[in-house]
Amino acid sequence: MNYTTICLAFQLCVIFCSSGYYCQAMFFKEIEDLKEYFNASNPDVADGGPLFLDILKNWREESDKKIIQSQIVSFYLKLFENFKDNQIIQRSMDTIKEDMLVRFFNNSSSKLEDFLKLIRIPVNDLQVQRKAINELIKVMNDLSPRSNLRKRKRSHSLFRGRRASK
């Protein structure tokens, strides 16, 4: 490696690190702006305990935690939607919403679109209710753990294989 390559690599590292730090600093600034707007640092906010943090502590497995996180993300999206016309905090909400969705959906726009589509489904619509009930069996089957079924099939076929070889 020559001197120019090393200098270029070093400069890129400095640029990427500082931009990441800048993004993180902006993220925290926007949260502080929202805390100030909602007066969320006031001592009475602690009354009744945390809203989400205790629940998150109870769910340890990554797949289980995603379920709870999806409900929490849904809550924040609804909260941000309620204040979408508020120009004072609009930029802060947009920044945090964008970062939250990137973190939760790992930059997958199709997952994000599906998630947003789901939370916007009107529950009081009769046609939606009918479709939901019609799809209920398939949804329930999809909720069933498939790993146990595969294990049973595999052990069953192994058992047959041993029996046949005798």
Curated annotation (Swiss-Prot):
Alphabetic keyword roster? Antiviral defense, Cytokine, Glycoprotein, Growth regulation, Pyrrolidone carboxylic acid, Secreted, Signal
- At what positions is Pyrrolidone carboxylic acid found? Q24
Alphabetized Pfam families for the sequence: IFN-gamma
Q: According to its UniProt record, where is this protein mainly located?
A: secreted
Where is the protein localized?
Answer: Secreted
Is this entry keyworded Secreted?
yes
User: Which residues are tagged as glycosylated in the record?
Assistant: N39, N106, N107
Q: Signal peptide location in the record?
A: 1-23
> In the UniProt record, does the keyword Nuclease occur?
no
Q: Name one GO cellular component term.
A: extracellular space
One GO MF term attached to the UniProt entry: cytokine activity
Please name the GO terms of the biological process aspect recorded for this protein, alphabetically. Answer: adaptive immune response; defense response to virus; humoral immune response; positive regulation of autophagy
Record note on quaternary structure: Homodimer. Interacts with IFNGR1 (via extracellular domain); this interaction promotes IFNGR1 dimerization.
The family annotation for this protein states: Belongs to the type II (or gamma) interferon family.
| Summary of the function given for this chain in its UniProt record | Type II interferon produced by immune cells such as T-cells and NK cells that plays crucial roles in antimicrobial, antiviral, and antitumor responses by activating effector immune cells and enhancing antigen presentation. Primarily signals through the JAK-STAT pathway after interaction with its receptor IFNGR1 to affect gene regulation. Upon IFNG binding, IFNGR1 intracellular domain opens out to allow association of downstream signaling components JAK2, JAK1 and STAT1, leading to STAT1 activation, nuclear translocation and transcription of IFNG-regulated genes.
Protein name, UniProt field:
Interferon gamma
Supply the source organism for this entry. Mustela putorius furo (European domestic ferret)
